[in-house]
């Protein structure tokens, strides 16, 4: 049994972490801190989650590490090199000495590094869908990826609005997640996020990137088959990342992945480009449950330990 602490336990990600940890029989939450109160002692914790904004994470991470805790940061403070963080987030990094030991917390790609880490930077919600979609396609696609993605309002840490209201708030390379997407996918990214104010959760990322000359020479269905095979091969027996196809009876959408720990992708080829549609729960796979997955890997446990009780872990 390990003892867990959560900074920012009353926020949406903090609440989602608590929702999952209730089902984890090898983890007990003994420390919680937010802007109004503190419960428990940090020094008694084995693992600490920072479900806080970037400035707070930079403050609390050194404290937690000094107390002997492993740290999983849910903000963007420990995902990028210092210069990229400061340029993308418009903040001065106040704990740059920790960046050299922070591991990017995407277990589908970096499980070995995470297993021996003292500190993990949990990926962002949009980057999770984009990176897992693009990274296996190196050498098969070229140029810059264009990404247009919708997210439920919980991605903006806000309550659902009663009336329909879709908000686009960034264009091109201005969003703070673009450097993260580019660094870990291996491709330049042009990104437009859209928040669906009347929807609570779910990311629907639509990615367009040019095919290599070799794949352009193939019939579209053959090129698409090779791309699907590359993604499926990259994740092998990983039950949490799947390539799916629409059928006459079912077209995949966010309702298939909300309240699951899955990321599913479908793709098509047209006029020399591949179009990938990646779907995930932004609070689950895009945040809290991936954080628990990181905790499990750091402890040497199964990635799904304790998560399968909180989420549907498969898709029909």
Please describe what each predicted stretch is.
Residues 1-171, 268-270, 304, 313-316:
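N-terminal Rossmann-like NAD(P) cofactor-binding subdomain of oxidoreductases
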Residues 12, 18-19, 24-45, 51-58, ...:
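C-terminal substrate-binding/catalytic lobe of Rossmann-fold NAD(P)-dependent oxidoreductases
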Residues 18, 131-138, 178-182, 228, ...:
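Predominant activation on well-ordered alpha-helical scaffold segments within soluble catalytic domains
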Residues 264-316:
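NAD(P)-dependent Rossmann-like dehydrogenase/reductase catalytic/cofactor-binding core
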């Amino acid at each position: 049994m390990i003892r867990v602490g959560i900074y920012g336990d009353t926020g949406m990600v903090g609440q989602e972490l608590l929702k999952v940890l209730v089902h984890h029989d090898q983890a007990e939450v003994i420390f919680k801190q937010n802007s109004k109160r503190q419960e428990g002692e940090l020094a008694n914790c084995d693992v600490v989650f920072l479900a806080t904004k970037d400035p707070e994470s930079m403050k609390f991470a050194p404290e937690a590490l000094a107390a002997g805790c492993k740290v999983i940061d849910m903000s963007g403070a420990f995902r990028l090199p210092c210069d990229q963080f400061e340029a993308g987030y418009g903040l001065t990094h106040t704990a740059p000495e920790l960046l050299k030991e922070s591991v990017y917390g995407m277990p589908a790609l970096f499980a070995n590094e995470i297993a021996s880490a003292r500190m993990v930077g949990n990926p962002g919600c949009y980057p999770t869908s984009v990176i897992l979609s693009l990274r296996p396609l190196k050498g098969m696609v070229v140029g810059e990826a264009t990404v247009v993605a919708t997210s439920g309002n919980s991605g903006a840490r806000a309550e659902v609005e009663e009336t329909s209201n879709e908000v686009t708030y960034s264009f091109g390379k201005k969003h703070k997640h673009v450097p993260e997407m580019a660094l870990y996918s291996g491709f330049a990214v042009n990104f437009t996020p859209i928040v669906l104010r009347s929807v609570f959760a779910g990311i629907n990322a639509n990615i367009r990137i040019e095919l290599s000359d070799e794949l352009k020479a193939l019939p579209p269905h053959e090129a698409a088959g090779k791309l699907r095979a590359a993604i499926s091969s990259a994740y092998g027996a990983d039950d949490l990342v799947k390539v799916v196809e629409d059928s006459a009876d079912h077209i995949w959408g966010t309702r298939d992945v909300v309240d699951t720990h899955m990321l599913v992708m479908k793709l098509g080829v047209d006029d020399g480009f591949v179009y990938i549609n990646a779907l995930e729960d932004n609070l689950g796979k895009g945040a809290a449950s991936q954080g628990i997955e990181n905790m499990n890997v750091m402890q040497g446990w199964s990635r799904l330990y304790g998560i399968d009780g909180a989420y549907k872990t498969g898709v029909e």
